[in-house]
UniProtKB/Swiss-Prot annotation:
Binds 1 siroheme per subunit. This is Sulfite reductase [NADPH] hemoprotein beta-component. The lineage of its organism: Bacteria, Pseudomonadati, Pseudomonadota, Gammaproteobacteria, Vibrionales. It comes from Vibrio vulnificus (strain YJ016). The gene is cysI. [4Fe-4S] cluster binds at residues 441, 447, 487, 491. GO terms for molecular function: 4 iron, 4 sulfur cluster binding; heme binding; metal ion binding; NADP binding; sulfite reductase (ferredoxin) activity; sulfite reductase (NADPH) activity. GO terms for cellular component: sulfite reductase complex (NADPH). Component of the sulfite reductase complex that catalyzes the 6-electron reduction of sulfite to sulfide. This is one of several activities required for the biosynthesis of L-cysteine from sulfate. Belongs to the nitrite and sulfite reductase 4Fe-4S domain family.
Length: 578
């Protein structure tokens, strides 16, 4: 036995990791994620969930939040915070039909505090500001159109991402089908979701209800992608498990498997760090689900259940050794990884505007700043997408860059859809390449973890960066992958950017430099806890040097490493804090 839990302590490969965290007790006692959520739903004295249920609703795809802009004012009035939930839908590969879109648009308008739909870096949508009386209605509305939110949060395999490449339609379809298969294979088998939210029949549970995840589920969240090179829009190195598509003559034949990526860290704790995924090797298609289960169960058994800050797969690999972890996966899957097939990641951005696929269909990628679909003054974006949904015969594809593709448009419908997009501010040639390559997480006012602004901070900050680029004579193609995240948990994927800002306190950020265009290098902290004004001053100096000293076609991140402005992070555990 390579692992055991005795006397509330965990031992892995002979090493005692310590006393189990309280989250392990919570999961053990939850009766396969049921807890007392149903009783909490009936309690209208508070708008929130209590005790363990605050954590358990995450496994059902929700986070309890409140509006931090009005928290102090409510406290003065002796009111509790305005508790509500954010829901993240399970949409493997990010494909949604026009009919589904119209239903979620209607729900967001009628039953959420903010009236918006938020496209996220997890290639799905989020509802923000749903009050307790509307939560069950929300789940039942989604269920009526074939959508759920099982396992989009919590210690489980989250929403499976898939490269959105509308040009390679046949290959994309194959990859998308695998994303769906992997999602279903790794999904919790508990009936708790249906019982609580869909008024399903109560069933007796047994120990083997969760053959892959186990009764206590995973030590920490787990993220999976299917990616088609050379496009790395899903950012493989932000994820625990990645299947890199290998094709011959346009047909998918297998995957290279990358394990152990992740970006979250904790300020001041050098045992936490962002980390690239390791390449385990190549597998044929028929072994995909076996390998997925083997990686997940190895992490289930070997991941740290004592310290949640060190519980993710990336830390397990660094603790036990990549070769040891890989050998265990081979043993459990009954395979031997072959040598990785050649591939290269060259880009991550979405191709904004129209492209034609090899199937003759047209695809329109709409740039949605920060993924926030809302009707702004003079730019009714949310209404615009709804109007397109009313006449669109194809589907929509949400991207991991928080944009939206109107996919599968016939030649006869193209002009009508473009007209609607332009009328509602969804197409704008004035959007710079810099803005298209900038991204932020939600942060304030809804995220309880946010230490600084991100989504609300980004638009003006990008305008300021555009001014700096222009000042130094750089043209529109000379842009920088720029990302802002309001805390070190990494939702905005700043730790794979050329310039990454990580929130430290209101108005203050850590400035990281040295990532690259393809998303294959982790940036390193350049300045700590500085203000927006100081950040812009630093960027001004750095961009000035880049403009004058760069090699032909040298991107900003590569330049900062080459000239020694920042040291390259090769092995995160060794280099990130060095």
């Amino acid at each position: 036995m390579t692992f055991s839990i005795e006397n509330n302590k965990q031992v892995v490969l002979g090493e005692e990791l310590g006393k189990l965290s309280d989250n392990e007790r919570l999961k053990t006692q939850s009766n396969f994620l049921r807890g007392t959520i149903e009783q909490d739903l009936q309690d209208r004295i508070t708008g929130g969930f209590t005790a363990d249920n605050f954590q358990l609703i995450r496994f059902h795809g929700m986070y309890q939040q409140d509006d931090r802009d009005i928290r102090n004012e409510r406290a003065k009035q002796k009111l509790e915070p305005l508790h509500n939930v954010m829901l993240r839908a399970r949409m493997p590969g990010g494909i949604i039909t026009p009919k589904q879109w119209l239903a979620i648009d209607k729900f967001a308008t009628e039953h959420s505090l903010y009236g918006s739909i938020r496209l996220t870096t997890r290639q799905t949508f989020q509802f923000h500001g749903v009050l307790k009386p509307n939560i069950k209605l929300m789940h039942q509305t989604l269920n009526s159109i074939g959508i759920d939110s099982i396992a989009t949060a919590g210690d489980v395999n989250r929403n499976v991402l898939c490269t959105t490449n509308p040009v390679e339609s046949e290959l994309h379809q194959e990859a998308y089908e695998w994303a769906k298969k992997i999602s279903e294979h790794l999904l919790p088998k508990t009936k708790a979701y249906a019982e609580i939210w869909l008024d399903g029949e109560k069933v007796e549970t047994t120990e083997d209800d969760e053959p892959i995840l186990g009764k206590t589920y995973l030590p920490r969240k787990f993220k999976t992608t299917v990616v088609i090179p050379p496009q790395n829009d899903v950012d493989v190195h932000a994820n625990d498990l990645n299947f890199v598509a290998i094709a011959e003559n346009g047909k998918l034949i297998g995957f290279n498997v990358l394990v152990g990526g992740g970006l979250a860290m904790t300020h001041g704790d050098t045992s936490t760090y962002p980390r690239r995924a390791d390449d385990f090797g190549y597998i044929p298609l028929e072994k995909t689900l076996d390998v997925a289960a083997a990686v997940v169960t190895t992490q289930r058994d070997w991941g740290n259940r004592s310290n949640r800050k060190n519980a993710k797969t990336k830390y397990t690999l660094d603790r036990v050794g990549t070769d040891v972890f890989k050998a265990e996966v081979e043993k459990r899957a009954g395979i031997k990884f072959e040598v990785s097939r050649p591939y290269e990641f060259t880009e991550r951005g979405d191709r904004i505007g129209w492209v034609e696929g090899i199937d003759g269909k047209h695809h329109l990628t709409l740039f949605i700043e920060n993924g926030r679909l809302l009707d702004y003054p003079g730019k009714p974006l949310k209404t615009g997408v709804a109007e397109i949904a009313k006449i669109h015969k194809g589907d929509f594809r949400m991207t991991a860059n928080q944009n939206l593709i109107v996919a599968g448009v016939s030649k006869s419908n193209k002009a009508k859809i473009e007209k609607l997009a332009r009328e509602h501010g969804l197409m704008d040639e004035g959007v710079s390449e810099q803005r298209k390559n900038s991204m932020a997480c939600v942060a304030f006012p809804t995220c309880p973890l946010a230490m600084a602004e991100a989504e609300r901070f980004l638009p003006q900050f990008v305008t300021d960066v555009e001014g700096i680029l222009d000042k130094h004579g750089l043209d529109k193609e000379d842009n920088i992958i720029l990302r802002v995240t309001g805390c070190p948990n990494g939702c905005g994927r700043a730790m794979l950017a050329e310039i990454g800002l990580v929130g430290k306190a209101p108005g203050r950020y850590n400035l990281h430099l040295g990532g690259n265009r393809g998303g294959t290098r982790v940036p390193k902290m350049y300045k700590e806890n500085i203000t927006e004004k100081q950040i812009l001053e630093e960027i001004d100096q750095l961009v000035g040097r880049w403009a004058n000293e760069r090699l032909p076609n040298e991107c900003f991140g590569d330049f900062t490493v080459r000239v020694g402005i920042i040291e390259e992070v090769i092995i995160s555990k060794r280099d990130f804090y060095a």
